[in-house]
């Protein structure tokens, strides 16, 4: 599951802040219930993998990835624990630019994004290229170390810009490749632009998204999700044939 909590862009008033600073970015900002959100997500995730594990192997357990502001990390960690996500791995995404242009001569500017990998008891499924032999043992020389920081790769021009807090398809693809296998299911409960659904589909994963804003939903459907698709049954086909 890839979950996205949206932030606010910055850098265009006299204080070097966004003109939206202190204002609601989205209609749901002031009535977003974090605990209901985690309750919903905990129900959507599959159960823990209970099979015995070999030494040095990850389980097939699920995880939840939440993008957030640095200041929100502790709040999310505490809320997640109350819904069974007792473990976490912090992720940092490094940009080679900053939107805080007017702050450049005032202070150090922000050029990072943050996320949390939340999971229950067992470490989640982890794919780093490691190959096992016929006895289930890791083959030396396969697999590579994955750091907890990533480059923030901008999308090409063929990816439409729909949502103010849209995450690049290239970045989401990296996370999906690490924590899922082809054929697995990816769910985005705050779908926004639909970039998560596109990334999942291009990697051969099934994907479902939820979005309460009709404008973002329509734009995602008509602009983001118009690439070459396979023959996967859509929910609209399901109801049409029911």
Question: Where do the language-model regions lie?
Answer:
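Core catalytic lobe of class I
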Residues: 1-210, 215-217
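Class I S-adenosyl-L-methionine-dependent methyltransferase module
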Residues: 71, 225-242
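Amphipathic alpha-helical interaction segments
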Residues: 101, 224-225
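Conserved SAM-binding loop
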Residues: 220-221
């Amino acid at each position: 599951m890839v979950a996205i909590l949206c932030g606010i862009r910055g850098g265009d008033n006299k204080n070097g802040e966004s003109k939206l600073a202190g204002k609601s970015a989205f209609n749901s900002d002031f009535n977003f219930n974090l605990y209901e959100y985690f309750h919903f997500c905990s129900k959507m995730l599959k159960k823990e993998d209970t099979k015995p594990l070999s030494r040095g192997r990850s389980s097939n357990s699920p995880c939840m990835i939440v993008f957030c502001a640095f200041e929100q990390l502790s709040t999310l960690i505490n809320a997640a624990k109350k819904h069974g996500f007792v473990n976490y791995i912090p992720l940092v995404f490094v940009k080679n630019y900053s939107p805080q242009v007017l702050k450049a001569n005032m202070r150090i500017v922000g050029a990072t994004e943050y996320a949390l990998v939340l999971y229950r008891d067992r470490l989640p499924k982890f794919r780093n290229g490691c190959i096992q032999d016929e006895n289930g043992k890791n083959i030396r020389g396969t697999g590579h170390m994955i750091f907890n920081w990533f480059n923030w790769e901008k999308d090409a021009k063929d990816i439409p810009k729909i949502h103010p807090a849209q995450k690049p398809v290239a970045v989401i693809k990296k996370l999906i490749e690490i924590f899922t296998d082809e054929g697995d299911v990816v769910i985005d409960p705050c779908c926004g632009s639909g970039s998560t659904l596109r990334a999942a589909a291009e990697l051969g994963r099934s994907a479902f998204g939820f979005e309460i804003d009709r404008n973002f939903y329509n734009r995602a459907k008509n602009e983001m999700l118009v690439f070459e698709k396979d023959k996967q049954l859509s929910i609209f086909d399901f109801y049409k044939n029911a």
